[in-house]
Structure formats: structure tokens, C-alpha cells
């Protein structure tokens, strides 16, 4: 992986948040806090950038589990304002009005988009910016809900790979129990990122960095990492299949 000066990266991230709040002439920032390392890291950066009193965290569970405890741990450790909104009744009401059965993925997308709506409703009422929590690994592979968790005003972590976010989280003092637990979007019980993606973040990031940033040939990546070529091809396919998710809707030129 690339070698980063994490002290400089953190300074850059903090300055970025400060600048965008000032440029946008808003009173603060809001973000969804899931109990995972990405949202925790953004919360820690935001509190450092503009002060804890200008940061609002929304904890929006569908399932009541350890993630809620971890989300509250982040809020309480930082001393930021927060609200807990259980989205189960909202999602269930939506589902009741559909004339077809939802699978886990469709329901998960509705959950993610419900959270986006709640974030923007609160942001509009308070004149806040919405901070996104997506990282580069998710962004490049399309591991996010279009118009859901990908929707934000600014995304501080969007150019950092997941393994790099873990390193930044450690430096910022994010609790170890959050850093060390298996990453999950929390869309259904037992769901984990790496199970969905079919690859560990450590290997995924090594491949992505070489494919996208270094623009290495697939055969050379496989040789350098001592992995089968089809692993590299699989990651490449994730990037290609999700291209539409990284762009605004387009139409033909007239």
C-alpha cells in the first residue's frame, strides 16, 4: 500500500471540514453515526475541526444491537449532541405500501435512503452540512446505496482506503472495540462487508491501489501480491459494474 504521513493527512482532513463549513456559511455539521469505524472517524475529525457543540450525530438503528452501544460510545466520548431515531417503523410502513415482497438488499437500500432523508431534514432545519462517511474502498467497488449512504454534502474519507481509515482512527483515539470489530453496513443481522464483497479489505485495498492509482497490469498485480489472476479480475469487475453509481445520471448528447 501507499505510504502516508498520517499527521499531515489528519491536518488536511480537519482543515477541509473547517473550510467547507466556513465557505458554506452554515452553523455546523451533521452525520449518521452507525457504530462503525468510518462514521466514528468522521465524528472525531469534525469535533476537532469545528468544536463538539457544532456537531450533531444521528443514530438511526433498524436493529437494536451492539452497534447502537458503539454509536452512543462515540457520541458520549466526544461530548457531541446526538439523537436516536429508530427507523424500523418508517421502513416497515414504507414496505406495507408496496405490492411486492422485499429481499434483504432492497430493504437495506430503503433503510439507507431513509437515513439520508432524516439527515437532510435535520440539516435543513439547523442550517448544517451533511458529512458523508464513505471511504475509497467502498466508493470504487460500488459498495454503497445510490442516493443513500453515498449522499452527502462533503465526504472527508472518500479518498482514503478502508485500511487507511483504520490507521487514522487509531491515531484519533477511536475506541479499540469499534476499530477491531468486523465492518458491517448493518443492513441485516449477521451481515458483514467482507462477506458481501467476497474479499478482505486488506487484500481489496492492495489490489485497488495497484489497479486504480498505479494503473498496473492485472498480471503484474497478481504476481506481485502472489494471488490468482481471477482475484484481480474480480475486483476489476466490481469497479466496472458500479461505474454508474459514481456518476450523476447522464443522457445522450443532442
Swiss-Prot record:
Catalytic activity entry: deamido-NAD(+) + NH4(+) + ATP = AMP + diphosphate + NAD(+) + H(+)
GO cellular component: cytoplasm
InterPro entries: NAD/GMP_synthase, NAD_synthase, NH(3)-dep_NAD(+)_synth, Rossmann-like_a/b/a_fold
Ligand binding (deamido-NAD(+)): 113, 146, 153, 244-245
UniProt-recorded Gene Ontology molecular function terms: ATP binding; glutaminase activity; metal ion binding; NAD+ synthase (glutamine-hydrolyzing) activity; NAD+ synthase activity
Record Pfam families: NAD_synthase
UniProt entry tagged with the keyword Nucleus: no
Class in the EC hierarchy, top level: ligase
Pathway it works in: Cofactor biosynthesis; NAD(+) biosynthesis; NAD(+) from deamido-NAD(+) (ammonia route): step 1/1
Summary of the function given for this chain in its UniProt record: Catalyzes the ATP-dependent amidation of deamido-NAD to form NAD. Uses ammonia as a nitrogen source.
Family: Belongs to the NAD synthetase family.
Protein name from the UniProt record: NH(3)-dependent NAD(+) synthetase
Species this chain originates from: Thermococcus sibiricus (strain DSM 12597 / MM 739)
Gene: nadE
Amino acid at each position: 500500500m501507499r505510504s502516508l504521513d498520517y499527521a499531515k493527512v489528519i491536518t488536511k482532513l480537519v482543515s477541509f471540514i473547517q473550510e467547507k463549513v466556513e465557505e458554506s456559511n452554515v452553523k455546523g455539521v451533521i452525520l449518521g453515526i452507525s457504530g462503525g469505524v468510518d462514521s466514528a472517524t468522521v465524528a472525531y475529525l469534525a469535533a476537532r475541526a469545528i468544536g463538539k457543540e457544532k456537531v450533531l450525530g444521528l443514530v438511526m438503528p433498524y436493529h437494536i444491537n451492539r452497534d447502537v452501544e458503539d454509536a452512543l460510545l462515540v457520541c458520549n466520548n466526544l461530548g457531541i449532541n446526538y439523537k436516536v431515531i429508530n427507523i424500523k417503523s418508517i421502513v416497515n410502513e414504507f414496505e406495507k405500501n408496496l405490492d411486492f415482497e422485499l429481499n434483504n438488499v432492497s430493504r437495506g437500500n430503503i433503510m439507507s435512503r431513509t437515513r439520508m432523508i432524516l439527515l437532510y431534514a435535520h440539516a435543513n432545519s439547523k442550517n448544517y452540512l451533511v458529512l458523508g462517511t464513505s471511504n475509497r474502498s467502498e466508493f470504487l467497488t460500488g459498495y454503497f446505496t445510490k442516493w443513500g449512504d453515498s449522499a452527502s454534502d462533503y465526504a472527508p474519507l472518500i479518498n482514503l482506503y478502508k485500511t487507511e481509515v483504520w490507521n487514522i482512527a487509531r491515531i484519533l483515539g477511536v475506541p479499540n472495540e469499534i476499530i477491531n470489530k468486523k465492518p458491517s453496513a448493518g443492513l441485516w443481522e449477521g451481515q458483514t462487508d467482507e462477506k458481501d464483497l467476497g474479499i478482505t479489505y486488506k487484500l481489496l485495498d492492495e489490489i485497488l491501489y495497484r489497479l486504480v492509482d498505479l494503473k498496473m497490469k492485472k498480471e503484474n498485480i497478481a504476481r506481485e501480491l502472489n494471488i490468482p489472476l481471477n482475484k484481480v479480475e474480480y475486483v476489476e469487475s466490481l469497479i466496472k459494474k458500479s461505474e454508474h453509481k459514481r456518476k450523476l445520471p447522464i443522457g445522450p448528447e443532442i
